[in-house]
Amino acid sequence: GRLTAAAAAKYGLKCIIVTVDDYDGELSGNLLLDGLFGARVIVKKNDGRDKDTQLTETVKRVMEQELQKGERIYFIPMGGSDVTGMLGYYDCAKELDAQAQEHQINGATVYTAVGSMGTYLGLYCGLKAIHSSLKLTGIAIMPLDKDKLHHYFLQAKEAYGFTFDDSDMHIETGYIRKGYNEPDKQVRHAICMMARHEGLLLDPCYTGKMFAGVLDMIKEKKIKLGSQLILLHTGGMPGLYTPAHRVKFEKELADTVTVIE
C-alpha cells in the first residue's frame, strides 16, 4: 500500500488503503509512511473470520461510500496482484535475463518470495515468454492457494495471449513458518546474516523469510553446493520497524551496544 500511496501523492490522487488487522494506535513501519504520503488508512478489526472475506466486504463497503460522494474509483487488489500489476515483474524478468546473459549466469535459479502471487506470476510469464534459460522457484511466505494461482494464470493467458501453460511452476510451501508476517528466530537470523555479510537489509515478512527458506533448502540439500542462485530483493525494509518485529530484534541485538563514560 505504501508505494501506491507514494504514487498517488506524486500525481495528486486521493488514496485509501483498506486492511484487516488489530491496531494498537501506534503509527510505525508502513502505517507511518502511509500517513506521511497523505493516504487514508481504514483498519477493519479482525473478527476471527477468514481475512480475505472480511477484506472483500470492507473494500466493497468503502467503495460504495466513496461512489456516493461522487468519487471515481480505481481499485488495486492486495499486492497489486492482477493482470495489470503482474506486468511490472514481467518486465523485470526480461531485464533480469538480459543481466544474467551479460554476466554469463546461464541456467541459474531465481528465488523470490510468494505472497499474493503477482511477483511470481509476472516473473514466470516473463521468463517463459522469452524462453529464458533462468529457472524460477518461489518460496511461499503464507499458505498457497494453488487453484487461485492457476485461475490467475488463466486470466493472464487470456489477457495477453500466452501460448505456454503453467505445468512447471515451482513453489516451495514448507517454509511458511507460523504464517503471513510471522517470522521466527531463523528468519531473523537470516536477516542478520545478509546484513552482516552483504550490507543488505531484508524484511521480516517477505525477503527475510525467502532467504531463510533458501538457507534451509541448502541444509536439506535441496539446493546443491555450487549452484547458481539469484535472490530477488522485492523491498519491504520498513517492516523492520513494525513494533512486534523491532522488539524481538532489539532483544537479540542488545549486546551490540556498549555504553562508556
Report each predicted region and the residues it spans.
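Short glycine/serine/threonine-rich phosphate/pyrophosphate-binding segments
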Residues: 1-5, 10, 27, 116-123, ...
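Glycine-rich phosphate/pyrophosphate-binding loop at beta-loop-alpha junctions
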Residues: 86-173, 232-261
